[in-house]
Amino acid sequence: MEENMNFITLTEPAARQIKILKSNFDNEVCLRIGVKQGGCSGMSYSMNFESVSSLRETDEVLMLDSFLVACDPKSLLYLYGLSLDYSSELIGGGFQFSNPNASQTCGCGKSFSG
């Protein structure tokens, strides 16, 4: 498990929402951020909580106030420098990704092409 403090940045609203969501879990969990095939533009973002014991040696890990953010090496190629924000607006709310590596994004903001 390697540490890289710059692979992703979180705004204060995003960090606050992640802490709220994390509080729903009893065990020690981290937030895994990655990419998967699919979505309007070819790739889509994935975010889920998983047990800290599931972290792999090859994962990049970012330690924040009270939680870990993990990313696998293949996803990191597409996500390095990602900024994650959160909005509670009824229309267009939720987590919002700002990815400097995306050559094209779709209107929903949840998928991109590299």
Swiss-Prot record:
GO term, biological process aspect, one: iron-sulfur cluster assembly
Compartment annotation: Plastid, Chloroplast
InterPro entries to which the protein is assigned, alphabetical: FeS_biogenesis, FeS_cluster_insertion, FeS_cluster_insertion_CS, HesB-like_dom_sf, ISCA_plant_cyanobact
Any one Gene Ontology molecular-function term assigned to this protein's record: iron-sulfur cluster binding
UniProt cross-references to SUPFAM superfamilies, sorted A to Z: HesB-like domain
A Pfam family recorded for this sequence: Fe-S_biosyn
Taxonomic superkingdom: Eukaryota
Gene Ontology cellular-component annotations: chloroplast stroma
Family: Belongs to the HesB/IscA family. Ycf83 subfamily.
Protein name, UniProt field: Uncharacterized protein ycf83
Organism annotation: Porphyra purpurea (Red seaweed)
Source organism phylogeny: Eukaryota, Rhodophyta, Bangiophyceae, Bangiales, Bangiaceae
